[in-house]
Amino acid sequence: MPLSYPHFRKLLLLDDEAGPLEEELPRLADEGLNRRVAEDLNLQLPNVSIPWTHKVGNFTGLYSSTVPAFNPHWLTPSFPDIHLHQDLISKCEQFVGPLTKNELRRLKLIMPARFFPKLTKYFPLEKGIKPYYPEHAVNHYFKTRHYLHTLWKAGILYKRESTRSASFCGSPYSWEQELQHGSTSLNDKKGHGTESLCAQSTGILSRTSAGSSFQSKFQQSRLGLQQKQGHLANGKQGRSGRLRSRVHTPTRWPVGVEPSGTRCSNNLASRSASCFHQSAVREEANPSLSTSKRHTSTGNAVELNPVPPGLVGSEGKGSVFSCWWLQFRDAEPCSDYCLSHIINLLEDWGPCYEHGQHHIRTPRTPARVTGGVFLVDKNPHNTTESRLVVDFSQFSRGTTRVSWPKFAVPNLQSLTNLLSSNLSWLSLDVSAAFYHLPLHPAAMPHLLVGSSGLSRYVARLSSNSRIYDHQHGTMQNLHNSCSRNLYVSLLLLFQTLGRKLHLYSHPIILGFRKIPMGVGLSPFLLAQFTSAICSVVRRAFPHCLAFSYMDDLVLGAKSVQHLESLYTAVTNFLLSVGIHLNTSKTKRWGYNLHFMGYVIGSWGALPQDHIVHKIKECFRKLPVNRPIDWKVCQRIVGLLGFAAPFTQCGYPALMPLYTCITAKQAFVFSPTYKAFLCKQYMNLYPVARQRPGLCQVFADATPTGWGLAIGHQRMRGTFVAPLPIHTAELLAACFARSRSGANIIGTDNSVVLSRKYTSFPWLLGCAANWILRGTSFVYVPSALNPADDPSRGRLGLYRPLLRLPFQPTTGRTSLYADSPSVPSHLPVRVHFASPLHVAWRPP
């Protein structure tokens, strides 16, 4: 007869009417009993021919990922002027005095961050934007391109200008100034002199060296200005001679991707020095130099739009090397859906290319990408905005994968010990936290994203559009791109993007200037950065608590008024070093902090409501007597494992599932096992904070017997049959807890100390987890253990009772270190009587 749930519950000693523990508990360690129960509950690994279930509720196997939904109305989030100040360390020292070694080490890691993988694979530009949404390919292309442009404008990306140069927007760092193109020493060596250099207030100089140097910078680029082969021979000064060998001939570009260039651009390049030095009046008097408004940064760097679009339109009629977009202007419409109808909507489509406020030299950067990008919803609760997903998975795969640095994350007990208190809490939201941390420019060639341009993207997607080299640039080939779908998509996009359609239709290559989210190094760097900042804050305000995990920062103080004062001071400090906070998303939690999926109060910690709701939904949809794919079991265990510490039997209850996942076998839920798990997860118990105390109860065991020392009382007992030593030690600890009720127990067994009961016989592990719940263990060496003699049957010998203090720990976590307090000569940071006379330390 199958084992019913009440019988199973009684067997696990979860009911009050169980017999004496010393008799009942050792039975649970019996292998035969564990095997029979597993057979009754159908927990043996099934060898069944029934097809596996690959979906349970929202859980699917890892290989059947849900298709993301495209939203044509996605908004691109705005990125504020994120610029982490380079003098961050000196500002922290002004705020709190000398920094500790830990803080200095962590802050130096990210000023700037470095990333140099062993091997980097380069992919063609067509793989730059992933075709995740085939039905909305053009829309997705432009939205992604707009997102990348926004990041570049915000100073988060470099734009590859040529094989060895890049431009960027925003405030420069000192290491970028060292790589600056127009540094005086460089030009003096080259013999260009300094008369063509504009002194910049920021220390970065705009690239204005004369004539051919400027020209060569664009000529060598596959994405910038390119001339016919004959024009390249003109450049004889500067570096253009060296660069000529690397130039790709324009004929390699299919139609629609050829860089914009006309005969006039040669003259423009030769006049570049004088162009940069024109006054504003001369600019206005000479509008042919640029049809778009010139942008001026704080450093007065002038954006140069190299090709006057009007001239391109007039000269490009039969030119192979004209801009693909503007070629349609004078073309005869091929149909009602010809792109020429859209191109003729505007007289001025703006520049083909934009260049940043500052130029720097970079290591050799090929015209390729190292990762693809696509858009998804910003998060499940915000589907109006998009988020850019960058796939740099090449660095985590294969034999050349990068082994990312590991860092400790606080476990549940450590987190509860640290944060479970009677403080008032609030959490801060750091805007685009990853994009605060600067990356060394030498890492740019390893982290490239971009797009191949609209024409090549469309040609790749449409079956009837083929690119032939011998047809390159002919009108017939030009109209191969025209289609109803493309026409309608572009017409709709024209409403929102306007003349940027032209800019975005050109190819571009961008490299990361700040750390990207898709690389395993980034979480490590972010965790080190925020934990160092929190350490500084804790030392400045020793009567308060600041803690962080990744970009989640929490502040705690004794009263609401004190917390508000702390919030103002900390916010001002963070803003002063360039950390951008989203103040509208600041959450005030009162006394129950919501953090890392937990609710933490003075009573302990519990999972947040949305996780409890997910678990209930999971059990509601869980089928019985049906083989469930082990990959789906992984998802189920991931959810249940998060809440396991809050249940009676904890992780051991999930061991049958773990076993089937390890064996890559399907798992069948029997009604009894499902009822057992369901009951476990419907009643969750808080994990309480450990409190310091004195250990006065000790346990020890041998394979044949157990012994306890409870105060001055000694007890001993024997097992019916010899047991493995770890099992015997665990039983002794359970007896000590049940007989004394003490929540601090001394033991000399490391496995019991670890409180991981998953390696014991299954039934014993489940029962022991419930008996020892909330118990703290102290290590006592065997030679000093007062319970050692009773366990060996010697009751007459009394060793002196040790005074073993137990001190809760915040775990081996790199994210929290006890910070020494601030030197006393610094002024007090909170300008009113603090509610505490002594410095508050985490419990």
Curated annotation (Swiss-Prot):
Renumbered residue ranges of the record's region Spacer: 178-346
Reaction catalysed by this enzyme: DNA(n) + a 2'-deoxyribonucleoside 5'-triphosphate = DNA(n+1) + diphosphate; Endonucleolytic cleavage to 5'-phosphomonoester
GO annotation terms (biological process): DNA replication; symbiont-mediated suppression of host innate immune response
Pfam families xref list: DNA_pol_viral_C, DNA_pol_viral_N, RVT_1
Key word Iron-sulfur present: no
PROSITE patterns named in the record: RT_POL (PS50878)
Residues given in the record as Mg(2+) binding sites: D429, D551, D552
UniProtKB keywords: DNA replication, DNA-binding, DNA-directed DNA polymerase, Endonuclease, Host-virus interaction, Hydrolase, Inhibition of host innate immune response by virus, Inhibition of host RLR pathway by virus, Magnesium, Metal-binding, Multifunctional enzyme, Nuclease, Nucleotidyltransferase, RNA-directed DNA polymerase, Transferase, Viral immunoevasion
Location of the region described as Terminal protein domain (TP) in the Swiss-Prot/TrEMBL record: 1-177
Record bears the keyword Hydrolase: yes
Annotated segments matching region Polymerase/reverse transcriptase domain (RT): 347-690
UniProt family annotation: Belongs to the hepadnaviridae P protein family.
Record text about domains: Terminal protein domain (TP) is hepadnavirus-specific. Spacer domain is highly variable and separates the TP and RT domains. Polymerase/reverse-transcriptase domain (RT) and ribonuclease H domain (RH) are similar to retrovirus reverse transcriptase/RNase H.
Protein's name in the database: Protein P
Name of the gene: P
